[in-house]
Amino acid sequence: MHAKHWIVACALALSGSWSALAQTISSPNKGLQLHFSMTKEGAPMYRLSFADGQEIIRPSHLGLEMKDAQKSFDKGLEVTDTKESTFDETWKPVWGEVKEIRNHYNELLVTLKKKSNGDPIAIRFRLFDDGLGFRYEFPGGKDRNFYVVKRELTEFAMTGDHKAHWIPGDYDTEEYDYVHSRLSEV
């Protein structure tokens, strides 16, 4: 193989590896950006920023500690697949203050597996014009339908003591008014 071909082959291989390790998606209006990456130890991380680069959530770890420590999804993971998609629908609520609600987001689905035993987990990110949502998913399988989560390791490294809009909860009711306060007051 000629040196020129070797350099091109290496560049292509490295660019493919990099895209599997770090990925960015934008909200539909391009105002927000989600950055997903993996550490050298195989730990998934994310951060959220405005389009101009100003961070909202600093780099934060993702993961789940399982009852069986060998099955924990916090490090020793590798990306096996990523898929991007867009969803846009308008629906009409039965009651409420608005007649129509638009559900519009860009999605990044990252599938990971444990290097030690091959157990899979997926993280589904949905980036809206006004925020981010994500969840962990356990792809089904013959012997992969029962997990015991000991502790969630998800981090939210906020860049400051921002304003929060939240509703308190209790064991016997969810009928409370929304509270507007600083994160430190939640």
Language-model region placement:
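Functionally constrained cores in energy, signaling, and assembly domains
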Residues: 5, 23
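N-terminal secretory signal peptides that target proteins for export/translocation
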Residues: 1-3
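N-terminal accessory beta-strand-rich subdomains and adjacent acidic, glycine-rich linkers
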Residues: 24-186
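Bacterial N-terminal signal peptides
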Residues: 8-17
